[in-house]
């Protein structure tokens, strides 16, 4: 999920992975899919010989010693009873649409490790200071095996759900169908419907599913009261969704197109994201990562309708670090060169993402609302003359906390007549409202994103798959 930056402020308006793109974006078997087919090797009867008994071996010949008494003809004429081979228990595999809980596919609780990169040598003059070491002590959760397990499980769910999305989403479907399909898949694999009080805080969507088309760069999701949009064969669609377990959010995004015209646009943004991942690390200045991203993206151009467009990095959205239950943690990674001296630090979690556009490369807020997010520093209770505001705030605290949510999620919980209360919370700065972000009409934009963990010994691209 892109973080809006301060440089600028509805929908359709007018280890070195390959950068090649296919007509429907980055398809392919997700990392760990073989494990989900095999049930991580722990299911089955354990015979390993398709029903052979005891020490019988396929192709083995048994002989009778000459000194042993030979059986009578009557004995030999009797038909020897053959034992029925044991039925082999078939390994579980993921269904389509994905509905098998991930814990059933990985009964040992061990999930695929993300792609790991060793750190390069530390640049002289950028070694950690004492204050940074103190900050690290307050966020050493990546040393906790349970946190790593939560992250890897959430990442595997993301891979399996996006694999289904890439294989099944086609023009002619509505954006509501697509969003609900993704979200139903995530909840099914988590084995948590999220309908009881507090369940959404245990696990669920990390933020509303983003389905931004063409000149809508980011922050669009179908919501009640809006006209539903039908996906067209000429559309370029950014698919951005998050999965959280115990507040640890995996944020990953990809772009789908159905026309090879846009292949170079997708390739540019994928290359820029992978360049950002390659350059990220402990003690690295964010400005250096930004400069590398810009250089990679601007080396591409795309021809549309006989006209050549440079691929421009979008200047007023950025990558970001992630805190527990907080998708935007405070640090930003712009896609253009800057003079910031802020560094990445050990123990931090980053969403490395890039957006590229054939338009201006900057955005304005569009019509409508994408979602809402409670201020992490907001009080536990609010005093408001509106009973609807007080009731809504209680619902937000019990079900979302500081996780970004949308109107669809409220109505799924059965919340009614909440708009006046929501407006009150927004106007008082307790809840932030997010609008769609638009580039110029007629332009096209793409996005790719991964979540990386800056562990002590390596950076782990936890959301990496065989697709992107």
Swiss-Prot record:
Biased composition (Basic and acidic residues): 1-10, 31-40
UniProt keyword tRNA processing, yes or no: no
GO CC annotation, single: cytoplasm
InterPro entries xref list: Creatinase/aminopeptidase-like (IPR036005), Met_Aminopeptidase_Type2 (IPR050247), Pept_M24 (IPR000994), Pept_M24_MAP (IPR001714), Pept_M24A_MAP2 (IPR002468), Pept_M24A_MAP2_BS (IPR018349), WH-like_DNA-bd_sf (IPR036388), WH_DNA-bd_sf (IPR036390)
Entries under CDD domains matching the protein: MetAP2
Keywords of the record: Aminopeptidase, Cytoplasm, Hydrolase, Metal-binding, Protease
HAMAP family reported in the protein's UniProt record: MetAP_2_euk
Official protein name in the record: Methionine aminopeptidase 2
Native source organism of the sequence: Aspergillus oryzae (strain ATCC 42149 / RIB 40) (Yellow koji mold)
